[in-house]
A protein has these predicted regions:
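Short internal beta-strands
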Residues: 9-14, 92
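A recurrent flexible, glycine/aromatic-enriched loop bordering the glycosyltransferase active site
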Residues: 109-119
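Acidic helix N-cap motif at the loop->helix transition within catalytic regions
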Residues: 19-24
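Conserved beta-loop-beta/alpha segment of the NTase-like Rossmann-fold superfamily
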Residues: 43-106, 120
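Conserved donor nucleotide-binding strand/loop of the catalytic core
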Residues: 29-41
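Conserved alpha/beta core of the MobA/IspD/sugar-nucleotide pyrophosphorylase nucleotidyltransferase superfamily
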Residues: 117-184
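A structural signal for isolated positions on well-ordered beta-strands in alpha/beta enzyme cores
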Residues: 8-10, 35, 159
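Short, small-residue-biased leader/transition segments that mark boundaries at the very start
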Residues: 1-6
Length: 184
């Protein structure tokens, strides 16, 4: 199959960290162009700023959480390739737990766990379609926790690429401990 390549990397950082991150990245030898952009008050704003900083000639945009440092090259390639016949692709892992919706401390109902997947990143989309979704979300005050959610509002077809448990998000002390065990 055709080999897809990543031309540019964009890192969104808080405004007050721009200079530090530019210095840090500048000290690393890399073969790709790395753009450092100011993020925003929300993930949506950071993604918008990042996407707008990419070349208009870019076909695909691959969004990845820096809090998921154990992403594999293979998962990135699978995500990019899944976009060939879809509007986008997300990495997700199947859920094996029983899921309940609860209201005011009481179980309301059980959701079929076979229908529940836990989204990870990367999430890859055609740049033009993602910009449509960002525009729609802004105009309609839609707040989302990931880009796939924005795409869903416009009925774009998003493929699921099976991820793996090591592509976890580091957000708690337990996650840090798990991460340090993987690095050692």
């Amino acid at each position: 199959g055709s080999e897809m390549c990543i031309r540019d990397s964009v890192i969104a950082v808080p405004e007050h960290r721009l200079a530090d991150v530019k210095t840090e990245i500048g000290s690393i030898k890399v073969s790709k162009n790395i753009l450092i952009v100011s993020g925003g008050p929300s993930r949506q704003e950071s993604v918008k700023n990042s996407v707008l900083s990419t070349s208009q000639n870019a076909d695909l945009v691959c969004i990845h959480d820096s809090a998921r440092p154990f992403i594999s090259e293979n998962l990135i390639k699978k995500s990019l390739n899944a976009c060939a016949s879809n509007d986008g692709a997300i990495v997700a892992i199947p859920n094996y737990d029983t899921i309940k919706t609860c209201v005011r401390g009481y179980v309301e109902k059980t959701i079929d766990r076979n229908d529940v997947w836990m989204a990870q990143t990367p999430q890859v989309f055609w740049r033009s379609k993602l910009l449509q979704a960002i525009d729609f979300s802004e105009k309609n005050n839609v707040e989302v926790t990931d880009e796939s959610s924005m795409m869903e509002y416009l009925d774009f077809q998003i493929s699921v690429v099976k991820g793996n448990a090591n592509n976890f998000k580091i957000t708690s002390p337990e996650d840090w401990e798990r991460a340090s065990n993987l690095v050692i």
